């Protein structure tokens, strides 16, 4: 079984985020990028399938993604058999989900996989559209919000999670696309020495792909910081003064009596 795991680099949320002048995107020039946390879960689940069945795991990323090399080398250090950096043969955007799905579909049309395991969503979109869009391009069955995958017979058995702690199991014939919410265990740690070994070995492959027919997708009209709906009053003084002021405020609002 050949498993392909698409990976995406997203802005590190510990960084200060600034907007572009036209307020349609974040300013990416000086940001640090890290692997999307849901893709890290997807990679771990793929590696668990490999551990159990001997499957081949190939991590792929788009060449336009900042810092994607680090994520791909880390995937090799964790146990992926190969890592591929994909470039588009035509103009394509790596920030729009529809364009990412089209380019990944173009690669997979040339390099088919028995199973595509990707994160259910990304930290910079939270729309969950990549797995179903990719499956639609490829004409494959798709299951998302998955928390376990196991190779079985002519396909895979997956556990899909619902609200309220409910879940159910499905058997899906391969080839198929699976969107992982969480792996069965926390993503494994890759020692720095192993990542450096992967870098020194020059293990990244490159590939060109022609995007499949992309849907128009979404257009961001405006990004802006949350608008303040009220104000906070800072209380100063010693403990007794602050306590008395709090009681007065609660009385003024009718929340306490006396």
Regions found by a protein language model. Name each.
Residues 1-258:
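N-terminal glycine-rich FAD/FM-binding segment characteristic of electron-transfer flavoproteins
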């Amino acid at each position: 079984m050949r498993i392909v795991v698409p990976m995406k680099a997203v802005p590190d949320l510990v960084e200060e985020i600034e907007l572009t002048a036209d307020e349609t995107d974040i300013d990416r020039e000086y940001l640090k990028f890290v692997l999307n946390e849901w893709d890290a879960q997807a990679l771990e689940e793929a590696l668990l399938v490999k551990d159990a069945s001997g499957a081949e795991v190939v991590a792929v990323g788009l060449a336009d993604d900042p810092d994607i090399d680090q994520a791909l080398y880390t995937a090799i250090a964790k146990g992926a058999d190969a890592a591929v950096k994909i470039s588009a043969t035509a103009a394509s955007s790596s920030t729009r989900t529809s364009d990412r799905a089209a380019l990944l579909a173009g690669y997979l049309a040339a390099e088919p996989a028995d199973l595509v395991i990707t994160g259910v969503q990304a930290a910079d979109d939270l729309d969950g559209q990549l797995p179903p869009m990719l499956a639609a391009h490829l004409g494959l069955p798709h299951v998302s919000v998955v928390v376990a995958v196991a190779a079985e017979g002519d396909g895979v058995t997956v556990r899909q999670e619902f609200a309220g702690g409910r879940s159910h199991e499905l058997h899906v014939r391969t080839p198929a696309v699976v969107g992982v919410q969480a792996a069965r265990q926390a993503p494994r740690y890759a020692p720095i020495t192993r990542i450096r070994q992967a870098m020194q070995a020059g293990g990244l492959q490159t590939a060109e792909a022609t995007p499949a027919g992309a849907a128009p997708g979404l257009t961001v009209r405006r990004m802006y910081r949350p608008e303040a709906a009220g104000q906070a009053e800072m209380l100063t003084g010693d403990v007794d003064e602050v306590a008395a002021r709090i009681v007065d405020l609660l009385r003024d609002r009718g929340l306490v009596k006396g």
